[in-house]
């Protein structure tokens, strides 16, 4: 794909619209995108911010989708930035759309406004996790579908494999998250899903994966339902910040040698922080809908917004949606 159009939800996120404006400027300054490739969806903006982005295409959208907006309500808010952005995806006016707004509302807009791809029953949230091997580990579904059937795991695997291609992972290994590795472990849905994936010769299915193996080199794609996946994600996030907090407290309370040791390890500690910092990952893909849809973290700052725009741009150039085999 030669030229692309990437849309950004002006009102999405806790720090919007200022974080979105600054993120757009950050992306332009660092040459992630050109002014011709970036579209701001939403027009209720201060004159000061408007002056900063006057050279960009701005698409009118009046209604704000708040964190309290229910997924069903957004479908009636046809003048909201979220609805307009997903409609532009559907009409091929955008190649990708990024929002840091209400997750449930965005997933609803993606599914019912942009629409599902042919042959996909359940779109899913797909993201890359850090791992011991420094290769990305793909988690799908990370929170879109709390209640699933066994057949939906088949869709999740296809979506994960498409994302693996985007990350240059060849012949990715697919595993199902379970409470044990034995065939008889898990509930009936998980066991039925395992049989479905075993039968599909296109999948490099390696069986069950336990939660303690999340960061090991046991597989490349971890498939699970959205309820479990979202809890995995939030547990990881909470654990990471707890460890960092305890590390800082230990250094603060330690003696001279502890502080000197921390000084020598400063570069390594910074690398560790960057590895678990959501801002460096940009966003989560909602795959299975008609177009590249990226969910940025709700508390995204300008840097995180810029990174989300960058991954959306790369995915659009890669024709990620075309890589989901039907």
Swiss-Prot record:
GO terms for molecular function: phosphate:acyl-[acyl carrier protein] acyltransferase activity. GO terms for cellular component: cytoplasm. The keyword Chaperone does not apply. Pfam families: FA_synthesis. GO terms for biological process: fatty acid biosynthetic process; phospholipid biosynthetic process. Its EC number is 2.3.1.274. It is found in: Cytoplasm. It catalyses: a fatty acyl-[ACP] + phosphate = an acyl phosphate + holo-[ACP]. Belongs to the PlsX family. Catalyzes the reversible formation of acyl-phosphate (acyl-PO(4)) from acyl-[acyl-carrier-protein] (acyl-ACP). This enzyme utilizes acyl-ACP as fatty acyl donor, but not acyl-CoA. NCBIfam families: plsX. Homodimer. Probably interacts with PlsY. PANTHER family: FATTY ACID/PHOSPHOLIPID SYNTHESIS PROTEIN PLSX, PHOSPHATE ACYLTRANSFERASE. This is Phosphate acyltransferase. The lineage of its organism: Bacteria, Thermotogati, Thermotogota, Thermotogae, Petrotogales. The gene is plsX.
